Regions:
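P-loop NTPase catalytic phosphate-binding loop
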Residues: 1-3, 10-24, 37-168, 181
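Short, charged/polar, Gly/Pro-enriched secondary-structure boundary elements
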Residues: 28-34
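Cytosolic-facing regulatory segments adjacent to core modules
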Residues: 169-176
């Protein structure tokens, strides 16, 4: 840390799941990681993940790809200007790049009215909306509750289908449905 002229370091002891100690030194020469680099990397292209998302690069500068399907919850938080929108766009772009419209639908809520507007161009393919809605991207906070209630109804109907089919996961159900068993 002294030879790098680092103002501060963080020690992670032990690194979870490993018998090692980590020393995190801030990088004062950060590199821009382009989305194209991530989406064309072998780690992303060749992945067998159900819902692959390209997050960024590891400390060893390797592309990092995670499976959104394996995450029970995902919270993105931070101060203004810290990259939350960039991260969200990376997740959305990853899924759009890897999935066909028949396999993926988004319900987008954008109370700021400007964060997700660029996705209005894919409305007919990737965005789900209520039958009586004019816009696929919800910007009116009053309509959010109604949309979430509709999603809960859809979720309950899907759970009923899983129960009838004797499946616990959507992947099991899809495999059963595709093979017509």
């Amino acid at each position: 840390a002294l030879s790098l002229s680092a103002l501060g370091i963080r020690i992670i002891a032990p690194i979870p799941g490993k018998g090692t100690i980590g020393i995190e030194v801030p990088n004062f020469n950060p590199q821009i990681v382009s989305m194209k680099t991530m989406l064309t990397s072998p780690q992303f292209v060749d992945t067998k993940y159900e819902l692959p998302i390209a997050i960024g690069k590891t400390i060893s500068s390797e592309p990092y790809v995670a499976d959104l399907a394996k995450m029970p919850h995902l919270l993105m938080a931070g101060a203004t200007g810290q990259g939350k929108s960039v991260g969200l766009n990376a997740i959305i772009s990853s899924l759009l790049f890897k999935k066909h419209p028949c396999d993926l639908k988004f319900v987008m809520v954008d109370p700021k009215k400007v964060e997700l507007s660029l996705y209005s161009k894919i409305e007919r393919h990737y965005l789900a909306k209520l039958p009586d809605s004019e816009e696929a991207i919800i910007t009116d906070v009053k309509k959010v509750v109604r949309t979430l209630n509709s999603l809960c109804i859809e979720m309950d109907q899907r759970y009923d289908l899983l129960k009838i089919a004797g499946c616990k996961k959507i992947t099991e159900y899809n495999a059963k449905f595709c093979s017509r068993r």
